[in-house]
Amino acid sequence: MDLRQFLMCLSLCTAFALSKPTEKKDRVHHEPQLSDKVHNDAQSFDYDHDAFLGAEEAKTFDQLTPEESKERLGKIVSKIDGDKDGFVTVDELKDWIKFAQKRWIYEDVERQWKGHDLNEDGLVSWEEYKNATYGYVLDDPDPDDGFNYKQMMVRDERRFKMADKDGDLIATKEEFTAFLHPEEYDYMKDIVVQETMEDIDKNADGFIDLEEYIGDMYSHDGNTDEPEWVKTEREQFVEFRDKNRDGKMDKEETKDWILPSDYDHAEAEARHLVYESDQNKDGKLTKEEIVDKYDLFVGSQATDFGEALVRHDEF
């Protein structure tokens, strides 16, 4: 077994070993918060910095001089302006904020890409992925660790085909990202729902009933009483999850559960940044307008917040 397979098995075994009967498994995919800072521009622009750059990148700007911050911000603006018309719209800014918040996903894809693009042609075929991930264990029809790797491979192949938009079984980096992180792509959400239902639907009737729903979250340990959160989840299932009150969740009800329509924090922040920076009030930003408000977008080591507030109030 190669290192990748060993680590995969180790992580799975560790997860099983460390899990406790009363721990709650959360299958709901929420949009992450843009920042753990309070969004109060009267006190600081830290929330805006985290939202625009991502929390880790925002820290690097705190070490720059104002001149360095402005220069680097100008380069970022050029990337945000997708259609290169010289303006940054709310939609372009929203897309950038979402990218900044999910930079870790792209970093994860980059790491995995190097291990799967075996012929280094800038693409990852299903054969490359299968050989790199399952090549060794498939030779052993009855592995000692008990995992059904063939079943896992069939499931991965189905997801790979869904991510592969042109159906050539060769993934571009964007398609490979959709394969590894399907919850981030609208066209992959059905496969996320399907896989979730397969995991929970123990009697394979195509639905998730109350006991299957609870059983996925909680393993009863002997004669102990159910934790309070389990009772709450039972109520949630009856009152909110099972919308048509037939005692089980179908595909659409499961989708509403695990992929809720959250408040779009990225769009709200994009509109806020445009409102605060749009000097001529034309609904879009020039590079000059953004750089002029660099303290709002990125800050710097030498930003005087009192002076920044004066400029903020002038607009």
Swiss-Prot record:
Sites of Phosphoserine modification: S44, S69, S261, S277
Positions annotated to bind Ca(2+) 5: D242, N244, D246, K248, E253
Record InterPro entries: EF-hand-dom_pair (IPR011992), EF_Hand_1_Ca_BS (IPR018247), EF_hand_dom (IPR002048)
Modified residues (Phosphotyrosine): Y47
Binding site for Ca(2+) 4: D201, N203, D205, E212
Binding site for Ca(2+) 3: D164, D166, D168, E175
Modified residues (Phosphothreonine): T65, T254
Chain sites annotated for binding Ca(2+) 1: D81, D83, D85, E92
Tissue spec. comment: Ubiquitously expressed. Expressed at high levels in heart, placenta and skeletal muscle, at lower levels in lung, kidney and pancreas and at very low levels in brain and liver.
PANTHER family in alphabetical order: CALUMENIN (PTHR10827:SF76), RETICULOCALBIN (PTHR10827)
Function text: Involved in regulation of vitamin K-dependent carboxylation of multiple N-terminal glutamate residues. Seems to inhibit gamma-carboxylase GGCX. Binds 7 calcium ions with a low affinity.
Quaternary structure and interacting proteins, as annotated: Interacts with GGCX.
Family note: Belongs to the CREC family.
Protein's name according to its UniProt entry: Calumenin
Lineage: Eukaryota, Metazoa, Chordata, Craniata, Vertebrata
Gene name of the record: CALU
